[in-house]
Amino acid sequence: METAVAYYKDGVPYDDKGQVIITLLNGTPDGSGSGGGGGKGGSKSESSAAIHATAKWSTAQLKKTQAEQAARAKAAAEAQAKAKANRDALTQRLKDIVNEALRHNASRTPSATELAHANNAAMQAEDERLRLAKAEEKARKEAEAAEKAFQEAEQRRKEIEREKAETERQLKLAEAEEKRLAALSEEAKAVEIAQKKLSAAQSEVVKMDGEIKTLNSRLSSSIHARDAEMKTLAGKRNELAQASAKYKELDELVKKLSPRANDPLQNRPFFEATRRRVGAGKIREEKQKQVTASETRINRINADITQIQKAISQVSNNRNAGIARVHEAEENLKKAQNNLLNSQIKDAVDATVSFYQTLTEKYGEKYSKMAQELADKSKGKKIGNVNEALAAFEKYKDVLNKKFSKADRDAIFNALASVKYDDWAKHLDQFAKYLKITGHVSFGYDVVSDILKIKDTGDWKPLFLTLEKKAADAGVSYVVALLFSLLAGTTLGIWGIAIVTGILCSYIDKNKLNTINEVLGI
């Protein structure tokens, strides 16, 4: 049984009892000796060899161990140096943390334990700072993303609001247009439709005019390009002819010199001519390519010109058809407008008849008849001398005023102070059509203003001057339309009726001024 080594001392192995362990290569030690011829001397020799072998092995092991220890010592020294450098670096980096402690312990050098605690605390603080920095960066990015999302949402909200507002605006316009169309008569709607069709037809013609203009511009450019290319082609063909002539000349020379081709003493001119012919052939081929390319470009330009001319012809035919549609739309619009005008005249006549009936009911048949006569006489009559008309009116007014109190006379001013201009405009348009007044008929804002001023000034001349100005083109019929529409849309009182009639008579028939009071029963 082999004894286990407990430890080594000076390179010698010992067991756990402190005895030296001797290991033999051939058996165990025996004090009586059993080997032949050797006796005790043989055992001693074998023991010495064993001890020597063990010592040799132990030395090797020790050297190995020593080398390992040296390596470990070196590694430890390196680790220590690294630790020291690391410690110094940490100490320097964390000097803000240990400054206070160093100030209190300036008389002594901090121990490694204190530095380790400080380093640990600093590392924890650094970890916390990094954690907070990462958290802050993450929060910042999340906040930026949230802000970006908010801005995008806000922008989208504003876009939706704008779209909503635009939709509401268009809806209001559509509703207003629908309401306006609903209020129109069938004749007026027909005019609207005819106007839209005419506008569409005219727009199509304008569009085709633009297309024709563009095509003509392209055609002109193509023709100029073709003419320029034709000049280039002429030059290229001339160059090709010269190159072909040169090649033919050299080819004939080669043929002429070919009998000497095999004569070493006389073949040099032949080979020189052959070389020159090859060069001339290449030049001729290049010129032919240039001519072919130019002809190709001309053919392409001609094809473009043909295509453009066909397009111009097609658009011109479409334009002619478009012009026909415009003429047709114009005729349809004219018919629709005539139908509308006839309908409006009929309505105006009906409204005027109703107006005369109202006058009959309110002021009697005689006054209604007088109003009709004044209207008929005004047709085609130019405005007379305003001063004469004013003088005749003033004379009638003075007589009339004696029959009415100031309160009665103020009735017309009170009525005009709250006049409804929309109603007045409606009646004015009807009377203008009834009296066949052409051109624009403006409202009587200035007429009302002049009448209202009379209440304070008593001066009627500004009113007569205004009426004269309005009737300068349309004639006295315009004055009739203005004042009849005033009678139809406003309750003026009997004095106001007499005054309005007096103004008309002063312009149309001064003799009737003497009969107004009788007709009205004043």
Curated annotation (Swiss-Prot):
It comes from the Bacteria. It is found in: Cell membrane. Gene3D superfamilies: Colicin (1.10.490.30), Helix Hairpins (1.10.287.620). The chain crosses the membrane at residues 471-487, 494-510. GO terms for molecular function: pore-forming activity; transmembrane transporter binding. One of its GO terms (biological process) is killing of cells of another organism. This colicin is a channel-forming colicin. This class of transmembrane toxins depolarize the cytoplasmic membrane, leading to dissipation of cellular energy. Belongs to the channel forming colicin family. Plasmid PAO3 is a small colicin E1 derivative. This is Colicin-E1. It comes from Escherichia coli.
